[in-house]
Amino acid sequence: MTEPGQVPTGKDMADRMAITEIIALHCRGVDRADEATLKSCYWPDATTAYGSDAVPAHEFCGQLAQAIQGYDQTHHMISNSIFAFDHEKAKVESTLIAFHYLKADDGQDTEMTYFGRYLDIFEKRRNIWKLKHREPVMSWSQNAPASHDAYHPALSALRQAARFPDDLVYG
């Protein structure tokens, strides 16, 4: 462990960058409903606790990719990651903001905004950092009628995000 504010070593910075990449890649996996990308973020023996009990993470990745397709669009963002290293393990707390857009047949589309944190345990094996355990903690959420307007003149020329494998990131 390091003292808060202590200048990190080059190794510490490299470890932080590798972990930060996995955290961001997980967000991409969720937003694109990409099961393979989600699984690549976890060790095969990893667990996750999106409810009261820890479950095998690789099994959950398939369920999450399927469930997220129920939304027309999602956007997950991470900020304020705090790292606590202990040799080849790291506890990481990251602030999460997630937006969910749901179209409705009756035209009453909704937006759900979620604020919380990911409490993660990472392990480094063979010089690779991956998640060993993830537990989201909710701070609050807000549901409201949708204000999304993809056809606004300022936005209408932009390509729309899509799920795996149709999103531009896979091209």
Residue locations for each model-derived region?
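Short beta-strand edge/turn micro-motifs at domain boundaries
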Residues: K91-E93, F115-D149
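Short beta-strand segments enriched in hydrophobic/aromatic residues
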Residues: V30, Y42, L96-A98, E135-M138
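A solvent-exposed, acidic/Ser-Thr-rich amphipathic alpha-helical stretch
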Residues: E35-L102
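Transmembrane beta-barrel outer-membrane domains
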Residues: M17, Y71-T74, E111-T113
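Short, low-complexity N-terminal intrinsically disordered segments enriched in polar/charged residues
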Residues: M1-R28, R32, A36, S40, ...
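Short, surface-exposed coil-to-beta transition loops
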Residues: H76-I78, T113-Y118
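Acidic/histidine-enriched, glycine/proline-rich intrinsically disordered or flexible terminal extensions
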Residues: Q142-G171
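Short, cysteine-centered beta-strand-loop-beta hairpins and adjacent loop/turn segments enriched
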Residues: F99-D109, Q142
